Amino acid sequence: MSKLFISTTNVGRAHEADIFGLSISTPYTVTCSGDGWIKLWKNRLLEGDLPKNNVISKFVHRTGVHHVDAFHSVEHGGVELDLVACVTFSGELVIYSVNMKQLAVEQVDLFSSSDKQKSYWCVKWFKSSDSEIPHKLLATDVKGSTRVWNLTVSHTEDADSRLQLILHGEITAPVANFATSCDMSPKGLIATGFENGSVIVSQADTLRPVYNFEGFGIRGTEESGRTVRDVKFSPMGELLAVANDSGSYGCVTLYETEYGERIGNLTVPTHSSQASIGSFAHNGWVFAVSFNSTGEFLATCGYDSKVRVWDVKMRERLSTLSLSAGDIEIEEDILLEDEFGDSLKNPPVFGVSFVEKGVRGGTGSDTNEGLCCICLDRSIRWYREAGGI
């Protein structure tokens, strides 16, 4: 079995500096960059529309922005929420409200004074499908704690006053360690990944840890660590995918969440002499993982300039996209070298996300899923699965 993805559109030099974050909501593909801007790229493009002519840009902070997550929901009474949370290199956590009719992005002040004193790193929204469970916002700080807020929505005429973030509590790391990533499952579990290679899974209601997973790749030395780059729960919350370093390689490990047992690793053949004692998903660090809407497939991306799609049940690779600077459609937007003169002919991939059916415009988007990725050549690429049109 294999899956074929074809390019639908792309944009080179999408930002003036490296693109570090990617998030897909129904209206927009959202990116953030070291240039200090977040950009909201319209998803439903008509034939002939160019992405750069259909983007909303918002300057956040001069130090740059490294994490971003978008939230879109239609609440009871038809109240539509479109929020973007991002974290700057100064450690500030910022939330914006998007007015889709006016194409305006405005900052909303939802944090208490104690919230603002923290220095944050990763941010993640959780969209609840249960009316009894509030939407949540998660954010890790540089000391390893994960703060959890409940998002409440009241029905008022003033769009800003109807939103409230109420601190639910904080998950404190057993030892101080940099918390690199976080996610929440619909089964009420929160996963936090750490620089030392561990992942702590906690209950969202009590904030108490229930599992502690360790990396299963080759143990890194002090010079080549085992940092966890990303954690993602499957849509039903039954699985947890963990991407971590193993020296200069990238590992992806799957765990089931009911009993906290390791299922196995996603593996491709490698020419490394250490292959017999390690299981590698990429020949470079894995920066991001993304489940599709059914949880059947997992997309991964890495420093090896590749995006891979895997069958989760069989743990088999179904597709590999090898990215090249020449993929970019507009020649003057191709970036062949970085500011240090290093080649970007085959750019590392910093982020990847599945795109649900019906989100993107164009032929086949209503019947086929897609992919979106961001690369070190400051580009954004969109794909859709071939066939079924």
PLM feature spans:
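WD40-repeat beta-propellers
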Residues: 38-42, 93-97, 146-150, 199-203, ...
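Blade-level signature of beta-propeller repeat domains, shared across WD40, Kelch, NHL, RCC1
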Residues: 351-389
